[in-house]
């Protein structure tokens, strides 16, 4: 392969993730973009999705037309987590936690600016990454016969010119489907077109599945060719969308330009948007010229711990997959715990527990029998100190939680073994996994040791069904989260603001929100308080909230400088960072407001709407959530 330029770095083996992130944000800032902070890894006030899973997710209201306080050009690096990818981790490119570099045009620029800018960022030696354009391949939308959507010929012409300016002839090849690509291969192409399954974006999927009113559009992806030999088990021929590992997607520009009509036709949006997402870790790997994401610098310290404790080297055939799973899972766990998530049996806590338990099993495979996860996780604090200092600040908590969970899971393994013994020759590996968290691989090994024939195909079928249901649930949650601005949910969101202030009035000013979950059926708030509330305190909180509902107070949104909002004492989300200009919602005018919070909305226009139909605010339950944290569930009825 042609050597590629490395970024300035004290390490000899490639660019640091911090360099790639910094250059990206500076590049787009120079082009008029406001750099906004990453949203929290757990979405605020959104019960329909467990995690922030893309850079676009926190910005959906603005892509749908709501004005953003920072303007029409935005850029960021967003912390993201995809639980559905847990089982995929182990190859050279899949991770659960990752950072998504993003830039957005909210009705501002479009294809003619976006594609040249990203190409320049990738290839420029002055402002960008200095990637060799010979290693870049792109895909575009081939059109969709079912919906009548035309092919994206405009992007094809833009890409031809960009490569041509670098002295590269960019042959266009129409593949249409991944299967066709597996049959025909590259054919000397540089630009490839695929159908709606690969190169169209909408929340509902392909054009035919989009409901009336839904927006969407074609996208154009960029792949980096690492020059690895093609693995024929992924198809006869290789092409950009092949999964053999030779090509890795490093960026995707989505052009939101259409809205579906009642008659199933599409019309151009009056304001077209650009939504770009680029994998930070994958871009860093491309700069290094090494397809293995787990060799980038943020994993160095953790990888060294595993090598020392196991006596094995990363790259050893029998160790690499276990290394990768532990490295990925402990990075995610570090961000989870430092964001306030604790191991548990539901929602985010369950996912964290699953990550930890899988890591313990993989450590066992490496021959590490003593506690090691806390030591592995320790290196991530320093690795992300520049962008996410809260991880390093929570080092002691991360260590304590991982050590505690590791001890607990060792006990779980003991319980699982007892149940396995009771089963005799009729071992139910799926039940052991779902009930006790007992790893299927461990059950399989013990069955082999005892000469028991375990029908692993049936087990894997059940596991695959279980995994698909989880993925479908995650997809439904994500889709629902984008659209759930239902009237009653909005009312509960406003009631949540009233409740938090009422708690501060009754329990003291040190009470602050530590989590929330709002649906159209009820609201839930986690808040800092060290003891159980008395019945009298709960009644007083209810009285205050209902009093503010009866007072028919206007709810006002104001965009202002962050410093001004802080001076006003506006409540803000625990652990979150905010841009220089923020939106605040106040119950009442700012100079005499009952409550003021940093918030993106939506809310009712007046508190009286919460009492429509004679409804009153009522606390259903007050209970402990975790140490020093209480939880209230409440309704309007």
Where do the language-model regions lie?
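A glycine- and charged-residue-rich anion-binding loop/surface
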Residues: 1-637
């Amino acid at each position: 392969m042609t050597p590629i330029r490395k970024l300035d770095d004290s390490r000899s083996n490639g660019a640091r993730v911090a360099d790639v992130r910094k250059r990206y944000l500076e590049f787009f800032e120079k082009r008029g973009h406001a750099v906004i902070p990453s949203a929290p890894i757990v979405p605020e006030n959104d019960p329909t999705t467990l995690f922030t899973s893309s850079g676009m997710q926190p910005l959906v209201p603005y892509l749908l037309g709501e004005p953003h306080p920072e303007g029409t050009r935005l850029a960021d690096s967003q912390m993201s987590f995809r639980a559905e990818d847990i089982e995929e981790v182990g190859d050279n490119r899949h991770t659960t936690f990752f950072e998504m570099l993003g830039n957005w045009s909210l009705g501002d620029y479009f294809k003619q600016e976006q594609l040249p800018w990203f190409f320049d960022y990738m290839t420029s030696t002055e402002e960008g990454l200095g990637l060799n354009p010979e290693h870049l391949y792109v895909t575009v939308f081939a059109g969709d016969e079912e919906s009548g959507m035309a092919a994206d010929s405009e992007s094809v012409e833009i890409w031809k010119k960009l490569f041509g300016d670098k002295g590269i002839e960019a042959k266009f090849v129409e593949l249409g489907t991944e299967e066709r690509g597996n049959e025909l291969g590259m054919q000397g192409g540089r630009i490839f077109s695929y159908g709606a399954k690969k190169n169209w974006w909408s929340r509902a999927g392909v054009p035919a599945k989009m409901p009336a009113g839904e927006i969407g559009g074609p996208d154009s992806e960029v792949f980096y060719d690492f020059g690895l030999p093609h693995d024929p088990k992924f198809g006869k021929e290789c092409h950009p969308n092949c999964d053999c590992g030779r090509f890795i997607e490093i960026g995707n520009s989505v052009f939101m330009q259409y809205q579906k009509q009642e008659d199933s036709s599409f019309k151009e949006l009056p304001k077209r948007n650009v939504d770009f997402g680029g994998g930070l870790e994958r871009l860093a790997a491309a700069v290094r010229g090494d397809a293995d994401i787990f060799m980038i610098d943020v994993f160095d310290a953790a990888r060294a711990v595993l090598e020392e404790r196991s006596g094995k080297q990363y790259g050893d055939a029998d160790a690499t997959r276990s290394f990768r799973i532990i490295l990925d899972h402990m990075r995610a766990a570090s961000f989870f715990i430092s964001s306030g998530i604790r191991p548990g049996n539901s929602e985010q806590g369950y996912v964290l527990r699953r990550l930890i338990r899988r890591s313990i099993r993989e450590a066992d495979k490496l021959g590490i029998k003593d506690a090691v996860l806390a030591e592995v996780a320790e290196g991530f604090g320093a690795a992300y100190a520049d962008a996410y200092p809260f991880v390093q600040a929570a080092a002691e908590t991360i260590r304590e939680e991982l050590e505690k969970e590791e001890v607990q899971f060792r006990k779980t393994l003991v319980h699982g073994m007892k149940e396995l013994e009771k089963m005799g020759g009729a071992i139910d590996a799926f039940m052991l996994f779902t009930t006790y968290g007992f790893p299927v691989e461990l059950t399989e090994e013990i069955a082999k040791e005892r000469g028991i024939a375990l029908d692993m195909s049936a087990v894997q079928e059940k596991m695959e069904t279980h995994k698909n249901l989880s993925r479908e649930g995650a997809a439904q949650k994500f889709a629902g989260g984008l659209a759930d601005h239902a009237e009653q949910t909005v009312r509960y969101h406003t009631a949540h603001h009233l409740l938090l202030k009422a708690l501060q009035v009754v329990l003291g000013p040190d009470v602050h929100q530590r989590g929330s979950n709002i649906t159209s059926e009820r609201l839930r708030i986690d808040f800092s308080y060290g003891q159980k509330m008395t019945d009298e305190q709960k009644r007083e909180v209810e009285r205050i909230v209902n009093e503010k509902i009866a007072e028919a107070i206007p709810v006002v949104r104001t965009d202002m400088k962050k410093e001004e909002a802080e001076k006003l004492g506006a409540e803000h989300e625990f652990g979150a960072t905010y841009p220089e200009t923020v939106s605040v919602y106040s119950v009442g005018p700012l100079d005499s407001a009952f409550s003021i919070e940093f918030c993106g909305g939506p809310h009712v226009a007046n508190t009286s709407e919460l009492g429509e139909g004679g409804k009153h605010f009522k606390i259903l339950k007050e209970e402990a959530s975790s140490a020093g944290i209480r939880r209230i569930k409440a309704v309007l009825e």
